[in-house]
């Protein structure tokens, strides 16, 4: 297995801390709003990583957190006259629904920052004891980044650009020093009683503490195999996580860092500040979750994905081919084609080279359709095809529906009954040799984007996009 490590900026062999075990931490959402397509892409990218590792024989522990203590959450909660727990729980449920619709496997653990305050306080106390952290007059605690000679080694950031965005806080020693603990400021603030005084943790200390508390190993209590997230988290979030871990415990937080690329809308980075966020729940109103997943995984995870509906519909044709083949076969699951399994898995083991994997898939779909044309009753062939498709379902998370359900997506139960009635009416017309009426019914349904197909088993139908 080879992965691209952001820190070393090269593709490297994956050599976990414990043989054939992989522990992965993926930065999850700050739950103050609904999740957008950027969140979806990150979740799908590292779901593919997990699936690939599992099918390669690794035991995977994947943790994805919820940041439920944050300025944005506090501000919105006060505006809506809610507690931060009430507000965050709404968006945690929304995020979970969205990812279920995208067929993202449930993480091994989903910790909330609010559940690990004691661990955060202990880590800050360690940094204070080592004289690496300092307190300013308003009670806030910052980390002195000059104490970390490797600061900036992960992101190699443009400091003048990034720090001007962060802004200078009075009494900070340097602009890049970052907050570990925010003291309670009174009205319209949230604070927790602690040995550090009443207050709340900074964003970066939250994730580091959750990493150690959920993924600690006996031989590496402060290091994990892979820390992953969106490219927008590289600086300052991941840089600061790595920094405070080195300062507190003298080790690198992760052996490998992985980052997925941005999602652009009309060639512009999607962000709430630009007002061009595309929420997952809104996309799901127009497209089934499997169709969205298929589209979002079709571009290599490190590349920028420029979202547009034309490309989405083109990518849907790949799903159509999977289900067309699935429609042709039934029976008992057979043995997978070993060459197909080896070839497609090797593609994914090469830093999730999904483009190459999809090319292998397309080739398999074409060749097996040809074999079926020549041997339509070959049970062994059908069993092999079913096994191949089952492996695709496990590896890529697509192709898991019944074909009739897939081709009838977006049609209500009452509409289905109306269509079946029309099909029955057409059948009677054909029996009575009234082919003009039969053709008229077909055209009527086609005008409503319902296509009829006559097969030896009877007439079937599907919804056109």
UniProtKB/Swiss-Prot annotation:
<keyword id="KW-0479">Metal-binding</keyword>
<keyword id="KW-0436">Ligase</keyword>
<dbReference type="InterPro" id="IPR032678">
    <property type="entry name" value="tRNA-synt_1_cat_dom"/>
</dbReference>
<dbReference type="GO" id="GO:0006423">
    <property type="term" value="P:cysteinyl-tRNA aminoacylation"/>
</dbReference>
<dbReference type="GO" id="GO:0005829">
    <property type="term" value="C:cytosol"/>
</dbReference>
<feature type="short sequence motif" description="'HIGH' region">
    <location>
        <begin position="29"/>
        <end position="39"/>
    </location>
</feature>
<keyword id="KW-0547">Nucleotide-binding</keyword>
<comment type="similarity">
    <text>Belongs to the class-I aminoacyl-tRNA synthetase family.</text>
</comment>
<keyword id="KW-0963">Cytoplasm</keyword>
<feature type="short sequence motif" description="'KMSKS' region">
    <location>
        <begin position="269"/>
        <end position="273"/>
    </location>
</feature>
<dbReference type="GO" id="GO:0004817">
    <property type="term" value="F:cysteine-tRNA ligase activity"/>
</dbReference>
<dbReference type="InterPro" id="IPR014729">
    <property type="entry name" value="Rossmann-like_a/b/a_fold"/>
</dbReference>
<feature type="binding site">
    <location>
        <position position="27"/>
    </location>
    <ligand>
        <name>Zn(2+)</name>
    </ligand>
</feature>
<dbReference type="GO" id="GO:0008270">
    <property type="term" value="F:zinc ion binding"/>
</dbReference>
<feature type="binding site">
    <location>
        <position position="237"/>
    </location>
    <ligand>
        <name>Zn(2+)</name>
    </ligand>
</feature>
<keyword id="KW-0862">Zinc</keyword>
<comment type="subunit">
    <text>Monomer.</text>
</comment>
<keyword id="KW-0648">Protein biosynthesis</keyword>
<dbReference type="GO" id="GO:0005524">
    <property type="term" value="F:ATP binding"/>
</dbReference>
<keyword id="KW-0030">Aminoacyl-tRNA synthetase</keyword>
<dbReference type="InterPro" id="IPR015273">
    <property type="entry name" value="Cys-tRNA-synt_Ia_DALR"/>
</dbReference>
<feature type="binding site">
    <location>
        <position position="241"/>
    </location>
    <ligand>
        <name>Zn(2+)</name>
    </ligand>
</feature>
<protein>
    <recommendedName>
        <fullName>Cysteine--tRNA ligase</fullName>
        <ecNumber>6.1.1.16</ecNumber>
    </recommendedName>
</protein>
<dbReference type="InterPro" id="IPR024909">
    <property type="entry name" value="Cys-tRNA/MSH_ligase"/>
</dbReference>
<dbReference type="InterPro" id="IPR009080">
    <property type="entry name" value="tRNAsynth_Ia_anticodon-bd"/>
</dbReference>
<keyword id="KW-0067">ATP-binding</keyword>
<feature type="binding site">
    <location>
        <position position="207"/>
    </location>
    <ligand>
        <name>Zn(2+)</name>
    </ligand>
</feature>
<dbReference type="Pfam" id="PF01406">
    <property type="entry name" value="tRNA-synt_1e"/>
</dbReference>
<feature type="binding site">
    <location>
        <position position="272"/>
    </location>
    <ligand>
        <name>ATP</name>
    </ligand>
</feature>
<dbReference type="Pfam" id="PF09190">
    <property type="entry name" value="DALR_2"/>
</dbReference>
<dbReference type="InterPro" id="IPR015803">
    <property type="entry name" value="Cys-tRNA-ligase"/>
</dbReference>
């Amino acid at each position: 297995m080879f992965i691209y490590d952001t820190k070393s900026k090269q593709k490297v062999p994956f050599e976990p801390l414990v043989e054939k075990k992989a522990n992965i931490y993926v930065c999850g959402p700050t739950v103050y709003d609904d999740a957008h397509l950027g969140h979806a892409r990150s979740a799908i990218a590292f779901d593919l990583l997990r699936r690939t590792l599992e099918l390669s024989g690794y035991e995977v522990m994947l943790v994805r957190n919820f940041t439920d203590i944050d300025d944005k959450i506090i501000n919105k909660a006060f505006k809506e006259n809610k507690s931060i727990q009430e507000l965050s729980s709404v968006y945690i449920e929304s995020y979970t629904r969205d990812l279920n619709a995208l067929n993202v496997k449930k993480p091994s653990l989903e910790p909330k920052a609010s559940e690990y305050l004691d661990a955060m306080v202990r880590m800050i106390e360690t940094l204070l004891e080592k004289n690496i952290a300092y307190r300013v007059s308003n009670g806030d605690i910052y980390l002195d980044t000059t104490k970390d000679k490797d600061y900036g080694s992960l992101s190699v950031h443009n400091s003048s650009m990034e720090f001007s965005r962060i802004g200078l806080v009075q009494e900070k020693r340097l602009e890049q020093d970052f907050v570990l603990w925010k003291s309670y400021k009174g009205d319209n603030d949230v604070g927790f009683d602690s040995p550090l005084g009443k207050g709340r943790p900074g964003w970066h200390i939250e994730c580091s503490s959750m990493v150690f508390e959920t993924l600690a190993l006996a031989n590496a209590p402060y290091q994990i195999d892979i820390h992953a997230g969106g490219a927008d988290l590289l600086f300052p979030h991941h840089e600061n996580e790595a920094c405070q871990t080195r300062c507190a415990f003298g080790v690198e937080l992760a052996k490998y860092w992985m980052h997925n690329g941005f999602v652009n809308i009309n060639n512009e980075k999607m962000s709430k500040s630009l007002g061009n966020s595309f929420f997952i729940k809104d996309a799901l109103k127009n497209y089934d979750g499997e169709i969205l997943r298929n589209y979002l995984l079709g571009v290599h995870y490190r590349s920028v994905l420029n979202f547009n509906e034309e490309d989405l519909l083109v990518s849907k044709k790949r799903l159509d081919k999977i289900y067309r083949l699935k429609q042709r076969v039934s029976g008992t699951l057979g043995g997978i084609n070993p060459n197909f399994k080896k070839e497609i898995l090797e593609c994914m083991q090469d830093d999730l080279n999904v483009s190459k994997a999809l090319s292998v898939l397309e080739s398999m779909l074409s060749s097996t359709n040809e074999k079926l044309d020549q041997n339509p009753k070959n049970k062994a062939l059908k069993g092999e095809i079913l096994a191949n498709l089952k492996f695709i379902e496990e590896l890529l998370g697509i192709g898991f529906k019944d074909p009739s359900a897939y081709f009838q997506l977006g049609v209500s139960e009452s509409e289905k009954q109306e269509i079946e009635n029309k099909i029955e009416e057409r059948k009677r017309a054909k029996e009575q040799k009234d082919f003009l009426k039969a053709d008229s019914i077909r055209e009527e349904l086609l005008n409503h984007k319902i296509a009829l197909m006559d097969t030896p088993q009877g007439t079937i139908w599907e919804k056109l996009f």
